[in-house]
Amino acid sequence: MTPIESTANSQTPLGRRLAPLFYAATSATFFAASSAPTPLYRIYQQAFAFSPVLITVIFAVYAFALLVSLLIVGSISDHLGRRPVIFVSLLLNMVAMALFLMADGPNWLIAARIVQGFATGAAASSIGAALVDLDPAKGSVTNSIAPLTGMAIGALGTSALVQYAPAPMFLVYAVTLVLLVAQAILIWAIPETTRRRAGLLASLKPEVTVPPQARRTLLALTPINIAVWALAGFYLSLVPSLVSTTTGSTAPLVGGSVVAALTVSAATTVFLLRKKIAATTLTFGISTMTLGILTIVAGVHIAQVPILIAGTLIAGAGLGTNFLAAVRSIMPLAKPDERAGLLSAYYIQSYLSFSLPAILAGFLSKAVGYTETTDIYAVAILLLVGSGVLALRAGRKKMVASV
């Protein structure tokens, strides 16, 4: 009897059938909550009178807290089980929502993002591992689609609430809080997917755990992975302000739509290409990401929202397929008790790429403006994509030579 069978047999048949859907929805909720503040940054900036640099700091502390969480508790669900860790993560995210609701200045926002980041880090590795436990092939696809879908829902949903509903700095967090409470209750009706094992205290020692059999693949994918997450970080921190400044559109839904276009396109493309092999999706992803970035730059320079959205949709397709290829390339290489640790290592690399370039972009935008910052950022991403192509070709040549 496998670990999954032994733990799941004590649960209801309904719980077993709904487990993948529940974990996917919970993952989407965490990432929707993480992107929900993005359309509110300009409102916060006006209400609390802070600079674009502080916007990126508020954005980035979330990622840094998430990294700390991954380093310390990223593998903890391999020892305690998936459900207890996800439950505590849901409770922590509720605390973050409460801090957002009470925020009356940037310090409250920073505190909320720190708690939210730690909660999301613990949840991301545990939920991701649970999905792969249930079905390695489908789990890898879901691990790609759910976060992207969640970020799109968070950005677009918040934008709509800001534009059409009252109390924009309150309502979105109240709605999210209700969802988190419901999921914290429902988690106990869902089957556990792994057995507890020894080594809990040792697992709390901060370290990046990449199984030897996955190291070469992860290294070859690193430049493209950095490019993917750097693009996502730029969108989720500065793009609403970029759209407003360069196009003159102040409607929150416009900026939110541009952000959502990236993740909606990414999630859709992941679903459409879910049965393709990683090499095929990488080729498509690299091509579309390059074309999309060039189109985005053109849209910024001619100050046309439709062109900007078109470029974003194209780049999003590249982002999603590259993300899918990375997850599908590395996760099957790990043993069941290595999955949470490997996923943590992948997310650490990803979220450093998500946050550090965005902070630099915040300083650049203050110094040279949003248009010039976009140009510099685009060049950097294209250079990373180019170096990634070279790294992948070199890796394939080594594999052929070793056969």
Predicted regions: what is each one?
Residues 280-326:
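C-terminal transmembrane helical hairpin of 12-TM major facilitator-type secondary transporters
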Residues 49, 81, 102-107, 166, ...:
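Helix-breaking motifs and short loop linkers at transmembrane-helix boundaries and internal kinks
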Residues 319, 327-378, 388:
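A late C-terminal transmembrane helix in Major Facilitator Superfamily
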Residues 254-278, 292:
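Transmembrane alpha-helices of Major Facilitator/SLC transporters
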Residues 171-187, 374-391:
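Symmetry-related core transmembrane helices of the 12-TM Major Facilitator Superfamily/SLC fold
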Residues 112-147:
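Cytoplasmic helix-loop-helix junction between adjacent transmembrane helices
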Residues 138, 142-188:
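Helix-loop-helix hairpin linking two adjacent transmembrane segments in secondary transporters
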Residues 67-106:
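Conserved MFS/SLC helix-loop-helix module at the cytosolic interface between two early adjacent transmembrane helices
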